[in-house]
């Protein structure tokens, strides 16, 4: 298993690739084209540019998180077939760029939810956490 770090991409992450490169053992990032909307096709040249930026920093791309599945696909609207075609072409373009891992984002609406965004750990660091019992029930 390789140690990787999530990087949101140029202009979307306060942590730079130079900083990530300084973390011992980290040779790759999990990244995305953050500005792309669900259902939109990722063009080969956009993927190549993202890959170039990461590789120029001395890192590799271990995978993509995520090529979002549009709500149009999920509920079968008139745009679903177009979005499915865009999804297929995006996966093909990622494969052609030698990126073979895509994490599927299954979370609806809010993308991710945690009950705490800064739970303090024993060493004083913080991490996101989820405790089901702290959520309101109806």
Enumerate the language-model features and the residues they cover.
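An active-site-proximal structural segment forming one wall of the substrate-binding cleft
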Residues: 81-102, 106
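Surface-exposed, active-site-proximal loop segments in enzymatic domains
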Residues: 41, 68-85, 110-122
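Hydrophobic faces of well-ordered beta-strands that scaffold small-molecule active sites
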Residues: 3-5, 27-31, 61-65, 102-104
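Active-site beta-loop-alpha junctions enriched in small/polar residues
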Residues: 6-10, 32-35, 66-69, 106-109
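Acidic (Asp/Glu)-rich catalytic clusters
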Residues: 17-25, 45-62, 95
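Glycine-rich, proline-tolerant flexible connector loops at the mouths of alpha/beta enzymes
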Residues: 33-46
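Short, acidic/polar
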Residues: 11-21, 84-91
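Conserved small/polar residues in nucleotide/adenosyl-binding loops
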Residues: 131-137
């Amino acid at each position: 298993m390789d140690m990787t770090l999530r990087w949101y991409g140029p202009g979307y992450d306060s942590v730079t690739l130079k900083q990530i490169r300084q973390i011992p053992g980290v040779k790759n990032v999990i990244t995305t084209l953050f500005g792309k909307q669900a259902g939109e096709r990722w063009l080969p040249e956009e993927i190549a540019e993202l890959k170039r930026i990461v590789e120029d920093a001395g890192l590799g791309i271990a995978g993509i998180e995520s090529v979002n599945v549009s709500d149009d696909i999920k509920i079968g609207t008139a745009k679903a077939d177009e979005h499915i075609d865009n999804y297929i072409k995006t996966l093909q373009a990622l494969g052609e760029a030698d990126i073979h891992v895509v994490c599927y984002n299954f979370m609806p609406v809010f993308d991710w939810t945690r009950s705490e965004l800064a739970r303090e750990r024993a060493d004083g660091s913080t991490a996101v956490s989820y405790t089901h019992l702290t959520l309101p029930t109806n």
